[in-house]
């Protein structure tokens, strides 16, 4: 989505809401709801090892290097164009696996407006996913302006509204006096530390991706040193509140062993509305959520692809990837994205469980995106050495030890998330462990490989040109 005009300077609240709009969603709440009360300890751990470090790193980089390009510009400044391209490619590639998770949420929500049993029908899910995926891809060909208008409406109806409803209906359920599905006890707060029980923790990063958005808009504020850190702090508070309350209320209402990772949000709506004898509201609400989800998806179809096309025009990728239509849309990248996303969507047909398919795609998404975040943490450390004289309106406190602590903890969080993604979760039937791990590893490698392949081809082309040049 396009940045605001330079004359429209952003304040703390406006900048914070940009972050909140890009992060808050009810779609990923079922993952943490599976943990019951122990989710509180896991949330605290994730906030400490990822959310706080990435927020601080984005605040420093965004205010020190407030230029267009975001993560690409930061990583390029630290490690050069090739590594910067790897970072922006990871942002593009992770969307290929992420799109089917959003589309499955949309399809499952729409099922509650037609027939709730369709939410577990694989054929229905895949057909609806592909129709909406290519439909939104076609809409994205209209350019950034069209995508931004659609996305503004979709962000509210597709992400923020469902999250608000999860919290509101969950609270209404408890205030009515209904019994919680997870009775409180001190022991329930302690998570099981078996690896297969902690596997979902690898995907919690998806609840917090996007916190770097405030850093992207640092140049659109009057006083980045004050505005960006405060906006990030406010966005963190709002995001954590929604995520924790939403996950808790879902766990209160739905039995843990019955929570679907795909349709858990609509299951909560249906269950609570039934207790209030308001079942008639389920279908129209499902329709609003589904339409909002489609609208929310549209700008994301275009955004990362546009970033890759800009880098391609700088000569760091094949020139054809940088070609655009009259609306400035990189058609080739959208087609490749559509074909690859469609292949990933077919996982819902191959894997026995809908929830397992959803989780595998979420795990691949997390594994690819943590590579980008790891580069951000490495960049904030390296730039303290290579560009120490650049003014930093916001500086991670503690000097070099402080930036090493924040960056080091963030890198550790990224590594942990990456490795946990390969562990089959005990909450799901994943089949043969070796096949599960192999599929995830293969998907992650295939999605991350192109930048290295492009670099190798360019190196060989350079050698060929040098060999044929007259001496």
Task: For each feature predicted by the language model, list its residue ranges.
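Helix-loop-helix connectors at the membrane interface of multi-pass transporters/channels
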Residues: 1-5, 73-76, 103-127, 161, ...
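Hydrophobic transmembrane alpha-helices that form the core helical bundles
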Residues: 34, 52-133, 137-141, 290-310, ...
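A generic transmembrane alpha-helix motif of multi-pass inner-membrane proteins
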Residues: 168, 364-372, 400-471
